Amino acid sequence: MRRTTRARTGLSALLLAASLGLGAAPAGADAPQRPAPTPASDSAAALHALDAAVERTLGDDSAGTYVDAGTGELVVTVTTEAAAAKVRAAGATPRRVQRGAAELDAAMAALEARAKIPGTSWGLDPRTNRIAVEADSSVSARDLARLRKVAASLDGAVSVTRVPGVFQREVAGGDAIYGGGSRCSAAFNVTKNGVRYFLTAGHCTNLSSTWSSTSGGTSIGVREGTSFPTNDYGIVRYTTTTNVDGRVNLYNGGYQDIASAADAVVGQAIKKSGSTTKVTSGTVSAVNVTVNYSDGPVYGMVRTTACSAGGDSGGAHFAGSVALGIHSGSSGCTGTNGSAIHQPVREALSAYGVNVY
């Protein structure tokens, strides 16, 4: 488990086409009607509600949850029959596994203490009941051998995989939100006491106190908070008087309404919206992920198989109408096989006391 009828102008219209990855109708136009919730949206919301209920019931009695690829059911890993009975009572499917939360947490702590190597990433994969470690192409043969030695000492609780590319934050020059001479994307519009903001990646908000919709253009927002490394989120307050919408741009003429926020579940299908690769799809492959970027580690991230590229940093990860995360980085994309990593959005919402809408 993890450690949450006035015409309106959309964010992408405000920032011009293809800027933030969020949006609705152009300024002065009638806002299109909000779509009714789709079955996919309802399914995602129901999944997260069940996952949250199981987490409240079991706490550390579970070694993680995931979505079964064949049945679509929520599977909860447990080590005792008593815990399995609680899972059944909650309406989910239990699966008995060898390692509990304490042993997996200890393996994570050992990696942090003994194998904190730039270019590595690790997180919980409850499908295998292991900590899944990835080492990118920048990790030397000597460091890889050291990593494998540490993994071998942990009684099978850790798997190590070499992956192509290099784990990096995905900032680029080009077309989207601009600050400090760099380009990023934005995740979700949020609100607090009637004031509108947008969330983006902390490594983006570290770069500049003001943000615009075009390179060198007029400022549309000012930084109100930033957190990177350790976390990877930041918040920008709108300085424009335009009323901005809270939907995500699907880059096909359509938009996804966002109604709630939740933590991602391993195995669930997600989408990523960013200003470079637009909308890409994938599944969640690990949670509670540590990524050792070259300029500092981030903790509690989520690893997915969605594709991403430079300039997508700060974009939205979502499932139906549920906001999941803020795009952080990846080790690249081969064909349709990606490694997009996100900062869980609920942590950012809590840190700044804001809500999606």
From Swiss-Prot:
Active site: 203, 232, 313
Residues making up the propeptide: 30-170
Signal peptide (UniProt feature, chain positions): 1-29
GO molecular function, one term: serine-type endopeptidase activity
Alphabetic keyword roster: Disulfide bond, Hydrolase, Protease, Secreted, Serine protease, Signal, Zymogen
Enzyme type, top EC level: hydrolase
GO cellular component annotations of the record: extracellular region
Subcellular location: Secreted
InterPro entries per UniProt: Pept_S1_alpha_lytic, Pept_S1A_streptogrisin, Peptidase_S1_PA, Peptidase_S1_PA_chymotrypsin, Streptogrisin_prodomain, Trypsin_dom, TRYPSIN_HIS, TRYPSIN_SER
Pfam family, one: Trypsin
Stated role: Serine protease that preferentially cleaves peptide bonds on the C-terminal side of aspartate and glutamate with a 10-fold higher reactivity for a glutamyl bond than an aspartyl bond.
Similarity comment text for this entry: Belongs to the peptidase S1 family.
Protein name: Serine protease 1
Origin species: Streptomyces fradiae
Organismal lineage: Bacteria, Bacillati, Actinomycetota, Actinomycetes, Kitasatosporales
